[in-house]
Structure formats: C-alpha cells, structure tokens
C-alpha cells in the first residue's frame, strides 16, 4: 500500500523541474529583444566659440526593452564619418538621453556646416555587454554659427578721384570694404561714414561718394576725406581710409591728339591715321563708347581707288573667262568709236564717259557676237540721278533698217532698271519671259554702282555692288517673227531702224560696259571687280582689343568700334590705318570723319563728343618713265622680207622703267644753305597693259605686206593682239619682260619688195590705260636689192656701157648698214661693212681696168685708121653704146632717192657719219677721179656723151 504514491510523486517532481526549466528559458530569451531607436534626422547649431551642439530634436535613444536593466538601457552613441570634429556622449542610460559636442575649436570661416551619421547601442544582456544591439543610422546636420570676430577692411589703402568744377556729380568714386566673417549678418558692410567734418560730400551705404554742392576750383583744389565702414553687427573698421578728391577746371569732352591732315606716300603700306588719339571724357563715368570712323572716297574714280586698266583687262585679272567684249574702250586707233564722247579728261583714275541726253555710240559690227539662247553677262558701272520718268537706254540692240524692234535692251525708267530680251523666232509661238524689272535706290542716287546681269533664259540675276537682287516683276511676250534684217548695237540710246533716228537717250555716266557670251560671271569675279584698292584697316596687337567690338563695312570704308573701357577703345583707335594697295594710286584728298556716341550710367548727365573731321592726302606717286630702246635703223635683203619668217622689227628691244627721287642731304650738311638736294634715278618693276605698233606713211597693204606674231605664244602670256591697216595693238596686263618677249616675236613680211625701199614703224607702250606712256620708239628698215657680184662683173666686162648702173647701185647703199648674211644679225659690224665696201671697190677697179684696156686697144686701132669715124670727137670711136631709156629714168629716180636718203640718215643717225662719208668719197672718186689720177680726170672729161650721134 505504501509503494503506490511513489511513482506519482516522482512524476510531479519531474513535471515541476521541467516547468522551471522551460519558464527560465523563455525569460532568458526575452531579456534583449529590441534594438534602440533614433529619429531619422537631427539638426544642430553650434557657435564657433562654444563646443556644445543644440540639437532639434534632442538626442534621445529609445529601447522597447526598457525598463529591463542592461537590455533596456543605452550605453553609447557612435558617429560615422571622415574627419568629423564631434563626438556623442550618453547623459542618462535609462532615458537614452545624449549630447553632441565638438572635439576641437570650430571656425565658421573655414567650414560653415557638417553632416554625418550617428548610431545608438544598448548595454546588451548583462554587465558583460554581450548581445549588444545597435539602432539604425540617423543623419545629423550641424551648422556653425558665426561670431562677429572680424572688423571691416578697405580694399585699397587710399582712394583718389578728380572731378570737374561746376557740376553736380551723381557719383565721384566708390570706396569698398570687406569683412572676413562667414555669416551674412557679420560679413556684410551695412554703412559707410565720412569722419571729416564740414565737407561737401556724402557717402551712401554702398560706398559711393558724391558732392552735395557744385565744386569750385578757385575755392579748393583738393579735398581729403577720412572714411570708415561698419558691418551689420555694428563693428567698425579697425583702420579708416583716406580719400583724395581733386577739383579740375572746366573740361571739354572730345577726341584729342589727332591731326587734321595725314600725308600718305604711295607704296609705303599701311599708315596709322590716329597714332596719338585719345578720348577726353572729363572724368565723367562712362558706361560705353561707340566710335565710327568713315573714309570718304566717293569722289575718287567710281566710288574709290581701283585699278584703272581697261575693263577687259580687269576681267582677265579677276579670273573671268575669255570672250569679253568692251563696248566703251579708251579711244585708240583700233577702238575709235568712243572718240566723240566726253570723258573725265584724265588718266589718274578710271576713265568714265558722260552722256548728256543727246549723245550715243554705234558699236561697229562684229564687236559683239551674242546668241540670246546661250548664257551671257552684261557688266557696267553707272552713275545716274532721278532725271524723271522717261526711258533712258544704256545698251540697245535693234533693227538696223525697216522696223523699230528691240532685240535686247538695258535701260532705266525712273529708279527702275529694266532688261528686255526678246526671243528669236521659233516654231513655238507662246509667251516667254521678256522684260525683267528691278526697283532699286542705287539706280537713281547719283553715286557710282556696279551692275552685273547674268542672263540664262528664262532667268536673269542682277548683282549690284556684289549683292544679288531678284526681279520684282517679269513680263512675258511672244518671240520675234522671222526677218533677215540686221541689227544695230548702240550705247546711250536706241536706234529706230524704221524711223532712222535715235531715241531714249541716256543721261548720266557710264564706264566699263562689257558683254561676254558663254559662261556666266562667277560671284568671285564680280566681287573682285567691285573691291576697292584702298580702305581702312585695324590691326590690333595680341594683347589688345580686350572688350572692344569691331565692325567693318564690306567696302573697308567704315569702321565701328564699341567698348566699355575708354582706355582700351583709345588703343584700338590708335591702330586704325589707311592702306592703298595700288602701286600708282590716284592722288588727292580722302576725307576722314569720326562720330561718337557715349552712354553714361546717369544718362541725364552724359557727355556729348563733337565729331572730328580730317583728311588723308594721297601724294602724287613718282611718275615712272617707261623707256624703249634698241636698234632704230637697219637693212635687210629683200629675200628676208619675202621669206615666211619675215624680218623681226624689234630684235634687241629693251623695256625698262625708272623713277626719279629726291635724296635729302646728310645730317652734317642739312643746315648748310649751299647744299642742295640731289636727284637719283632708280629702276622699278611694274606691269604694262598696252603696246601699239603703228606704221608711218602709207597704211599696210594686206595684199602684199603684214605684221605677224605667234598667237600661241601670246595666249601663253595672256596677251591679246588686234590687227588693223595702221598696225597691231597688244593688250593685257603683263610684266614688262613679257611684253619685251612678245615684241621680239613681231615680224614684218612683204612679198612684193621690188618697189619697196624702206618702211618705218613706231612703237608706244603704256601702263594703267594710258596714264603712263613710254617714249616713241621708231624703227626704219631698208630693203637691199642686190645682184650676184661675179655675174655682174662678167656682164660689165662684156658690156662697158653698164658701168654707170653698177656704180649707181653701189651709191644707193651709201649711208646704210649693209645687211649681214646671217639671218639673226641685226646691224652688221664695222668690219663687215669695211669688207663689203673693199670687195665692191675691188670689183669696180677690175671692171674699170678692163674698160681702160679695151679703150686703149680701141685708141690704137683708131690711130691706124685715121680716116675712119672722123665725125667722132672722142677717142673711143669704135665703141658702140646702147642706152636703155628705162635705166636712165631709174638712174635719175634712184639718184634723187639716194640724195634724200643720205640727207635723212645724216640728220637721224649721226653714228653712221663715217660710213656715209667714206661712201661719198668713193662715189666722188668714181665720178671725178682722185687727186693723184690726172689721167683718169682727163679721161672722164673726154667721156662726154654726144647724144645726137648715138644710135638706139
């Protein structure tokens, strides 16, 4: 009975122990269940001279394990971040309260705020600190509050200013102080104060000083002010500043340091026109200045200085294709249809033609060959005014007879430019564009303008001064009906073929009128033709042009400069230069004008700068002297003239150009009145544009003579040639060496030289369309008619009566240089002349000897037979002489020509006097005999012809 309760007790004990064990485990597991908790963000403020940070919200870490000991307590805070000068301290473990404090002295001027993260951790499960749990990371922003520890400091040690008397200045100068504190409250300067009493000046909160009354230079020349500054924390500057304000007498604003006359010497490059100019603003505060410099060149040439070559040459220089026909060329032997037109009467600048409403020029047939179906270009310089509403024709192609149809025409109507182009007859009879209208101020503003029409049916493009313009109106018309009537091209009016009179006369000035068929004018060519050779230039050094805006007009005649800094603007103005790139510019005045606009901070008191007017005097360039030299007189055999090569007219031609300069005396003799300036001639190089070879005397006969040149060589040189009955004209802008080479190639041919004794030619070269002319270089070529000397001697031996013709032929050559047998020799040397004369004289003596022997023989025969031929009163009775009447006439004619030639040669060629004299002496010996040959003299007296006894 007692044993039964034992198992039940044991079971209860086991259950109790198990319950105790189970309950204790649950309690232990619930000791540190939760992590500490912090606010996500904290904002703090700390003063730079304190170390405690005031946080919002306060730093308190919460733990749900509270109030358990250890697990519910906060043991510390941990700060995360690099170089964070703060640490966090737990004030109360049970409440989790803590503080953040700085570890070192903070400086707001170095760093104004800090940002870092912080974590809280509890005490763990027990005193050993195991099982510690950490909160999430919270962000902390801390701002360092400034302390007014720095006083204001002025930027400058002293200030200076100058003002003009008698003005109320809105601001004379500004004093400025700074504060090193970091906060806006203590770093800003809130006020300035003038400490000097009884002065007529005030200073505002921004530091601007102005006068309270008008200053008087006579009363006070200079004021000295002491000025201090306060920051917004009322802290005064430790050091006050001294301000000196000078009073200046009344000032006149404007440009100073410029000269009204600037002399420009040609060929010197760019010339600074305002090297010492500066703008006097009379110390007015200037916000900006705009200065416009204008060069007035409208009175020079066609608006400015340009090359004055012929328009055809200018087109070639600008790269235009060949085929340009010039309708208003300078008058010459080859282009003479503009002779009657009034011109500018000078060659210093472009040659222009004036039309007064009653004049017109008929263009010869063949000058222009135009196919309206193909592209073509019309180019012209025009100056025209508002002369009313009548049509005024520039260029017109119309029917020559029977009808008044206009085929194409360029005319003005008021301020409109109109181009008419009627299509040629075609199978399609439908309307086509025929009349193109442009309304432009340039047509009637009385200034020179350059007009270029690019015609490519059905469109026409107009360029005025290089700017393209589309027609505002295009009128259509039917093509012309077919006829066989020729057309007449006229400049300055339009020919009415049906009425046989001119109409629609032009009033104005024209120049450079050209027509070119084929390829249209390129824009680069058009710009090149319009570009001026003179203008204003501004080359600013690398360290300059700071803050200065520069604008240049397309014509280089207007420069506009704008800048805020007057000093920098002055530097830019001092670098403005005048440049004329022509070797021989047009002399005269180019007016200069400066207009200025000044903007001030206080526009009510802004200054006005009066305009400046001056001029550039382009001096007369040293006039070049173009000299042509070479052989003036030579003779050639007739066979050379008749050969295919002909005779070179200018084989040794030399072309040089020189200028004469005045050389000032050296410094030692500059003050000596007896020392005079010396003239020095120096050779220069420039181009030529024309060389004209004309024949003197009768015009060239194309049936028997010509002037020829290798055209292929000319094209390589870029030179054109025009032939006429008067000679040839070479045109094209090329070097003197090129023209020299071309003239060496010019040859004269004559394939009927029997009646030709000589031919004379004249050569003149020019530069700049006749502005500079060379000397007249004259050449005389003689034709030598010769026979075979051996055959002639035999003939004379057999026929003594021909001695006199041979003698005459020899005399014909006296006074001339005998031709060298070498085809390239120009003038035979003296030795050659002597040899030829000696050989001729020897032949003559042989013939004379034969004649005398025969005469002696005849005299012996006569003595033997004295009864025969008693009627003859001379010894050579047996001699029968037959005289050719034609030879007698030729002898007389030749003798007259011989005397004239000898007289001309004695006056023209003094260097040939020796040859002439020797030839005359030989001739006289033949006619009269020498002083030592008395027998010959007697014989000559005996040989007196009795024409009555001669039988023909």
From Swiss-Prot:
InterPro entries: Cadherin-like_dom, Cadherin-like_sf, CLSTN_C, ConA-like_dom_sf
Domain Cadherin residues, every copy: 38-154, 155-255
Tissue expression as described in the entry: Preferentially expressed in the retina and brain.
Cytoplasmic membrane side: 852-952
UniProt xrefs under CDD domains: Cadherin_repeat
A GO molecular-function descriptor: calcium ion binding
Membrane topology according to the record: Single-pass type I membrane protein
Modifications the protein undergoes after translation, according to the UniProt entry: Proteolytically processed under normal cellular conditions. A primary zeta-cleavage generates a large extracellular (soluble) N-terminal domain (sAlc) and a short C-terminal transmembrane fragment (CTF1). A secondary cleavage catalyzed by presenilin gamma-secretase within the transmembrane domain releases the beta-Alc-alpha chain in the extracellular milieu and produces an intracellular fragment (AlcICD). This processing is strongly suppressed in the tripartite complex formed with APBA2 and APP, which seems to prevent the association with PSEN1.
Record keywords: Calcium, Cell adhesion, Cell membrane, Cell projection, Endoplasmic reticulum, Glycoprotein, Golgi apparatus, Membrane, Nucleus, Postsynaptic cell membrane, Repeat, Signal, Synapse, Transmembrane, Transmembrane helix
Compartments it resides in: Postsynaptic cell membrane; Endoplasmic reticulum membrane; Golgi apparatus membrane; Cell projection, Neuron projection
Bilayer-spanning residue ranges: 831-851
Principal location listed in the UniProt entry: membrane
GO annotation, biological process: homophilic cell adhesion via plasma membrane adhesion molecules; neurotransmitter receptor transport to postsynaptic membrane; positive regulation of synapse assembly; positive regulation of synaptic transmission; regulation of cell growth; regulation of synapse maturation; vesicle-mediated transport in synapse
Composition bias type Acidic residues, residue spans: 896-930
Entry's Gene Ontology cellular component terms: cell surface; endoplasmic reticulum membrane; extracellular region; GABA-ergic synapse; glutamatergic synapse; Golgi membrane; membrane; nucleus
PROSITE patterns the record matches: CADHERIN_2 (PS50268)
Residues marked Cleavage (site): 795-796, 824-825
Biased segments, Polar residues type: 934-952
UniProt keyword Glycosyltransferase present: no
Complex and partners: Directly interacts with APBA2. Forms a tripartite complex with APBA2 and APP. Interacts with KLC1.
Name of this protein: Calsyntenin-1
Phylogenetic placement of the source organism: Eukaryota, Metazoa, Chordata, Craniata, Vertebrata
């Amino acid at each position: 009975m007692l044993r039964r309760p034992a198992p039940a007790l044991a079971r209860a004990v086991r259950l109790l122990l198990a319950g105790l064990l189970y309950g204790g485990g649950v309690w232990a597991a619930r000791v540190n269940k939760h992590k500490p908790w912090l606010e996500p963000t904290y904002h703090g403020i700390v003063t730079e001279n304190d170390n405690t940070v005031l946080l919002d919200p306060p730093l308190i870490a919460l733990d749900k394990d509270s109030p358990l000991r250890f697990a519910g307590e906060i043991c510390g805070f941990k700060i995360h971040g690099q170089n964070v000068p703060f640490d966090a301290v737990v004030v109360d473990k049970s409440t989790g309260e803590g503080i953040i404090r700085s570890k070192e002295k903070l400086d707001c001027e170095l760093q104004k705020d800090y940002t870092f993260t912080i974590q809280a951790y509890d005490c763990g499960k027990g005193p050993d600190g195991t099982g510690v749990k950490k909160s999430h990371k919270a962000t902390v922003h801390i701002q360092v509050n400034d302390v007014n520890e720095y006083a204001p400091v002025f930027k400058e040690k002293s200030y200076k200013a100058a003002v003009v008397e008698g003005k109320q200045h809105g601001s004379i100068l500004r004093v400025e102080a700074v504060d090193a504190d970091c906060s806006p409250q203590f770093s800003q300067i809130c006020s300035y104060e003038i400490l000097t009493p009884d002065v007529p000046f005030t200073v505002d909160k921004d530091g601007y000083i102005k006068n309270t009354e008008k200053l008087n230079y006579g009363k006070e020349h200079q004021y000295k002010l002491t000025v201090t500054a306060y920051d917004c924390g009322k802290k005064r500057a430790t050091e006050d500043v001294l301000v000196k304000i000078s009073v200046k007498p009344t000032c006149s604003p404007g440009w100073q340091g410029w000269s009204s006359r600037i002399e420009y010497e040609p060929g010197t490059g760019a010339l600074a026109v305002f090297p010492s100019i500066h703008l006097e603003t009379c110390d007015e505060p200037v916000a900006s200045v705009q200065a416009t410099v204008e060069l007035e060149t409208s009175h020079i040439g066609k608006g400015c200085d340009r090359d004055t070559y012929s328009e055809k040459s200018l087109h070639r220089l600008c790269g235009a294709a060949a085929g340009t026909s010039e309708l208003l060329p300078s008058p010459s032997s080859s282009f003479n249809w503009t002779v009657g037109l009034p011109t500018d009467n000078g060659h210093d600048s472009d040659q222009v033609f004036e039309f007064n409403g009653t004049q017109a020029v008929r263009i010869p047939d063949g000058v222009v060959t135009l196919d309206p179906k193909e592209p073509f270009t019309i180019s012209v310089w025009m100056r025209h005014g508002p002369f009313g509403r009548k049509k005024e024709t520039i260029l017109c192609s119309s029917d020559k007879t029977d009808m008044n149809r206009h085929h194409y025409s360029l005319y003005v109507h008021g301020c409109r430019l109109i181009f008419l182009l009627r299509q040629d007859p075609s199978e399609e009879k439908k309307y086509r564009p025929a009349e193109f209208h442009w309304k432009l101020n340039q047509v009637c503003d009385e200034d020179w303008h350059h007009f270029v029409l690019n015609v490519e049916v059905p469109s026409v493009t107009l360029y005025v001064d290089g700017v393209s313009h589309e027609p505002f109106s295009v009128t259509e018309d039917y093509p012309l009906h077919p006829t066989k009537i020729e057309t007449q091209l006229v400049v300055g009016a339009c020919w009415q073929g049906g009425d046989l009179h001119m109409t629609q006369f032009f009033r104005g000035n024209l120049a450079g009128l050209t027509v070119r068929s084929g390829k249209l004018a390129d824009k680069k060519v058009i710009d090149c033709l319009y570009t001026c050779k003179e203008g204003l230039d501004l080359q600013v050094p690398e360290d300059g042009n700071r803050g200065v805006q520069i604008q240049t007009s397309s014509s280089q005649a207007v420069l506009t400069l704008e800048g805020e800094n007057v000093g920098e603007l002055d530097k830019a103005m001092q670098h403005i230069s005048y440049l004329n790139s022509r070797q021989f510019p047009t002399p005269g005045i180019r007016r200069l004008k400066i207009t200025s606009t000044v903007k001030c901070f206080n526009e009510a008191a802004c200054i006005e700068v009066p305009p400046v007017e001056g001029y550039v005097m382009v001096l007369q360039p040293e006039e070049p002297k173009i000299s042509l030299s070479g052989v003036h007189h030579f003779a050639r055999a007739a066979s050379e003239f008749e050969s295919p090569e002909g005779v070179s007219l200018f084989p040794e031609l030399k072309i040089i150009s020189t200028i004469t300069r005045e050389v000032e005396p050296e410094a030692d003799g500059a003050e000596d009145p007896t020392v005079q300036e010396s003239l020095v001639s120096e050779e220069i190089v420039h181009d030529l544009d024309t060389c004209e070879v004309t024949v003197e005397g009768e015009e060239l006969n194309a049936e028997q003579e010509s002037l020829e040149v290798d055209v292929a060589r000319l094209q390589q040189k870029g030179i054109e040639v025009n032939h006429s009955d008067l000679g040839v004209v070479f045109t094209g802008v090329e070097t003197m060496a090129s023209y020299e080479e071309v003239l060496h190639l010019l040859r004269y041919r004559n394939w009927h030289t029997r009646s030709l004794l000589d031919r004379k030619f004249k050569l003149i070269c020019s530069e700049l369309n006749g502005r500079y002319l060379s000397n007249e270089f004259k050449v005389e070529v003689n034709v030598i008619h010769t026979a075979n000397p051996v055959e002639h001697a035999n003939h004379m031996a057999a026929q003594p009566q021909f001695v006199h013709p041979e003698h005459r032929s020899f005399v014909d050559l006296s006074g001339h240089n005998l031709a060298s047998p070498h085809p390239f020799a120009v003038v035979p040397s003296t030795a050659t002349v002597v040899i030829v004369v000696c050989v001729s004289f020897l032949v003559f003596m042989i013939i004379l000897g034969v004649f005398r022997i025969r005469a002696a023989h005849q005299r012996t025969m006569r003595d033997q037979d004295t009864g025969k031929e008693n009627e003859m009163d001379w010894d050579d009775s047996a001699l029968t002489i037959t005289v050719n009447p034609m030879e007698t006439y030729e002898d007389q004619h030749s003798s007259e020509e011989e005397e004239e030639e000898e007289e001309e040669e004695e006056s023209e060629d003094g260097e040939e006097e020796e040859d002439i004299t020797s030839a005359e002496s030989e001739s006289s010996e033949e006619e009269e005999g020498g002083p030592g040959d008395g027998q010959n003299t007697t014989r000559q007296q005996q040989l007196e012809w009795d024409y009555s006894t001669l039988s023909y």
